Amino acid sequence: MVTNLLGVFGFLTVILRAVILCAQTFAVGGVIFLLLIAHDPTLRSDSWVRPASRVIRWSALTLAFAHVFFVIVNSLVLTSSIDLSMREVMGANFVIAGTLGAAAGCALFFWPGGLRGPANYFTLIPAALMIAATVLTSHAASRMDDRVVLVAMTTLHYLATAAWLGGLPCLLLVMKNVTDLDVLARVSSRFSRLAQFSVLLLLGAGIVMSIYYVGSWNAVYGTAYGVMVTTKVIFFLCLIVLGSANYFLVRAMGTRSNDRDTKISLIRFAEAEIGIGLTVILTAASLTSQPPGVDLTQDRVTLHEIAVRFEPRMPRFESPSLDSLSPSSKEMRRKAKLAGRKLPPAFVPGGSMLHINTPGDIAWSEYNHTWAGVAVLLMGLLALL
């Protein structure tokens, strides 16, 4: 079982990190929304506070379970791949962070009154602990240099993301369940101002972290980390466009007779923002699986190599022959066991790899990606119908 876990460990940690970031964003963002946007009792009604509290509480519980699984998976991999006992692993930073995050998530889920009562600023305590737990397992906490600056920027980044993207589900619930246009205008206006401030924080923190983590222009296109940061920036710009449209709609609300049409437009834009926001968060989770570009000073991809790779050519639609593919790691371990040999459970730098990718392996990867691209293209075309 543990051997199979090693094979999917990288993918599994990215998935768990994505769940943690998404759940944290909605839980903390919901708390911020209740305390900063809707603290006035005249803006609160059971029609939207009840479902909003459910979103916050279940996000917090999801966060708790994700932290528990994250600790279990990492602990099993560590004890099976290197000579560490479970007792020694229990003192690792990721265990402390996971325990802290799980406790904070459970505290918010079991909060007295289910968050439906008056604004309670003590809920900021578990919200802050959630952010702290995630920061402890980020790139910032593992850096040897400039750790204080990077931890501060990462914290601001998470807080701003939660305040903006995490508050959108609550705003959506207000717009769908409240009929009083005056209340809608006040809530939307307050959230718009908070979103603008959050965007400034995100932009500032993002620029600082990019300088420290990417380091140079050739790392932007020459490393996987730089390319993924660029992807995040593109999605961020898409969110800015949608947010700008929302800003002008909010300003118009209450000044013309078709406010109900404005409300519908706000709902549609908010739904689109949530979807793109989730994509940005998933991209951020993928970044944690990559070393920062500034650390990869060797073997960076050049512009010439990129141009050659992107030169138009017919895609591969046929699978390579099975004989040209490398044997599976599971099959290699089975044969090694029958031969009385023991293969390393994990790759050790400087050691030998189980196998090196052959031209057949590369062709197989291209074949899979080609058909995956066809599927995505068809889905996009169908969405336009």
Task: Locate the predicted segments by residue.
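The feature marks the first
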Residues: L21, N357-G380
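Polytopic transmembrane helical bundles with strong interfacial aromatic enrichment
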Residues: M1-G351, G360-A363
